[in-house]
């Protein structure tokens, strides 16, 4: 931090919620839920790239993610638009030992934002995580006031702050 008590925005807020009292996900007409198991790894990769366009994440990087334990294509959730575009994406990482799952990352294609897709995707994803055996769900976001969109989404579906990190980086003049 630049000074004691300062907030330069470079910190993460970690959020948690129990997988109880889950709302039914609601999508706009003709949108539908899919998984990477349904659409294949190439389409799931494109959804990721579209959600964070422009992205420095290489197209080939998703193959490494998909090959990493505990990646499961049935827990890589997506929303498909009526025209076939994969409009929202989230990967759920599930640890069966701790019975905890984490959303990372969560994103919506820029042409489909502010339509409730992220909210619906998270409700659907939490139900899938619970059905897989999870009892607790986690998600992280940038924590400062300048980054309210993700925090608003996550808190809107019942996540509450668990902890935060503090970057210890010396600033050079």
PLM region descriptions:
Residues 1-29, 166-170:
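Acyl-donor-binding surface of acyltransferase catalytic domains
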Residues 135, 160:
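Short acidic/polar active-site loop segments enriched in Thr and Asp
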Residues 32-44:
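A short beta-loop-alpha structural element at the N-terminal edge
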Residues 49-110:
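A conserved beta-strand-loop-helix scaffold within acyl/acetyltransferase catalytic domains
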Residues 105-108, 114-131, 151-156:
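Conserved acetyl-CoA-binding loop-helix of GNAT-fold acetyltransferases
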Residues 1, 154, 159:
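Conserved active-site tyrosine of GNAT-family acetyltransferases
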């Amino acid at each position: 931090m630049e000074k004691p008590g300062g907030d330069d925005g470079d910190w993460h807020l970690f959020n948690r919620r129990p997988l109880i009292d889950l709302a039914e996900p609601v999508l706009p007409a003709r949108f539908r839920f899919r998984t990477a198991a349904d659409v294949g790894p190439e389409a799931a990769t494109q959804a990721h790239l579209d959600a964070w366009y422009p992205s420095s994440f290489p197209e080939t990087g998703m193959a490494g993610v998909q090959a990493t334990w505990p990646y499961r294509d049935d827990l890589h959730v997506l929303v498909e638009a009526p025209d076939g575009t994969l409009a929202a994406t989230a990967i759920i990482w599930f640890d069966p030992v701790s019975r905890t799952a984490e959303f990372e990352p969560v994103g919506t294609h820029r042409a489909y934002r502010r339509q409730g897709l992220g909210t619906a995707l998270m409700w659907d994803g939490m139900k899938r995580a619970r059905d897989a055996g999870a009892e607790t769900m986690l998600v992280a976001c940038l924590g400062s006031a300048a980054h309210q969109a993700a925090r608003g989404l996550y808190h809107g579906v019942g996540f509450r702050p668990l902890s935060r990190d503090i970057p210890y980086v010396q600033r050079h003049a």
